[in-house]
Amino acid sequence: MRFTFTSRCLALFLLLNHPTPILPAFSNQTYPTIEPKPFLYVVGRKKMMDAQYKCYDRMQQLPAYQGEGPYCNRTWDGWLCWDDTPAGVLSYQFCPDYFPDFDPSEKVTKYCDEKGVWFKHPENNRTWSNYTMCNAFTPEKLKNAYVLYYLAIVGHSLSIFTLVISLGIFVFFRSLGCQRVTLHKNMFLTYILNSMIIIIHLVEVVPNGELVRRDPVSCKILHFFHQYMMACNYFWMLCEGIYLHTLIVVAVFTEKQRLRWYYLLGWGFPLVPTTIHAITRAVYFNDNCWLSVETHLLYIIHGPVMAALVVNFFFLLNIVRVLVTKMRETHEAESHMYLKAVKATMILVPLLGIQFVVFPWRPSNKMLGKIYDYVMHSLIHFQGFFVATIYCFCNNEVQTTVKRQWAQFKIQWNQRWGRRPSNRSARAAAAAAEAGDIPIYICHQELRNEPANNQGEESAEIIPLNIIEQESSA
């Protein structure tokens, strides 16, 4: 049961953690499954038959051996194809991916002895290829799988907790309301829903081997909603990138943008690839609970997601270019200018989600690969926590608004219960309660005396960052 539990964790991790699992580096990294699903048996057998057909075709097409001295004849050993090999040579290939517990990054060896005969195992005197390394590191991978499994649960739980608090702050404090905060709230909601679905999947589906074997429609529906929310997550990131790019680069500082197009892109468009994927998956690759990543049909969803990330990457580059240009115009010291640029970039990176574009390939080295796994899993599973921290808890306007509300609450509490605060604390509380002390960071608040026909609308964001100055109309 331990092997079954962990193997499904690993299969799910491949599906959840990478924008596209068909990249070359990802295809060379599979994890052990001791109790594979029947559908995957069919897939593995088909791969083996295709490899056998290609091997016999290759053996017929290759010319005769041109070397001197004894050699071992080309052969199919049942799993892999071996070319003519000179005597005394140890040949090797990467492990096949027919079996879920085989690691294709490891190597298979086959020895041709000095007489030109393939090595035979002493126990049965039959030709033998050494496949022992293909699953030699299973215990180490199991231990690593458990760590990554619980890291995912902790990360998504912490993300839900912090995002709910952040969302509550943005909803409760109406003074923070503006178009950019509206985009924040929608993106926060996608993070919350996606993390909830992932936790349900990890807790209820992954360790439940009987449920996966029964393959109910409910687990596929859960998978559908996970894929949909994952796509919504990245497309709301794209909405944030488009909005920031419009404000900073296009410089539409004084006009309110039409948010309905953002709603259509963030919530509506992901339904298209997700629905197409579900239909084609049910017809062409209907594996149990749709846990397998051994299908190119995932490109239907991951292709648009990767496109959104690439677009956001170029948005980030252009935004940073504009920010650096603006900061140069302020004639500040060079070191301070680049410090601001780095700070602005580090704030925008988790928002635009470009870590998959900057570091999309897993290193083949074991140690570097393990470091990569932990770094990428931390970025992925704790991304909601990072976003909530950067865009809510560390935001100056949010901090000032919360402090002002807390100061007002303390004044009301003291007045109600008859406790008289000291003159120093009273002056500090009164100063914190001043509405004009709110720094411009999230959005530039318009004047309070708005026209009557604009009442109830959200104020447009005029200046998204302190370092951006409104250009004079010319």
Swiss-Prot record:
It comes from Homo sapiens. Residues 1-24 form the signal peptide. One of its GO terms (biological process) is positive regulation of ERK1 and ERK2 cascade. Sensitive to cholera toxin. GO terms for molecular function: amylin receptor activity; amyloid-beta binding; calcitonin binding; calcitonin family receptor activity; calcitonin gene-related peptide receptor activity; calcitonin receptor activity. This is Calcitonin receptor. It is found in: Cell membrane. It comes from the Eukaryota. The chain crosses the membrane at residues 147-169, 182-202, 220-242, 260-280, 297-320, 341-359, 368-394. InterPro entries: GPCR_2 (IPR050332), GPCR_2-like_7TM (IPR017981), GPCR_2_calcitonin_rcpt (IPR001688), GPCR_2_calcitonin_rcpt_fam (IPR003287), GPCR_2_extracell_dom_sf (IPR036445), GPCR_2_extracellular_dom (IPR001879), GPCR_2_secretin-like (IPR000832), GPCR_2_secretin-like_CS (IPR017983).
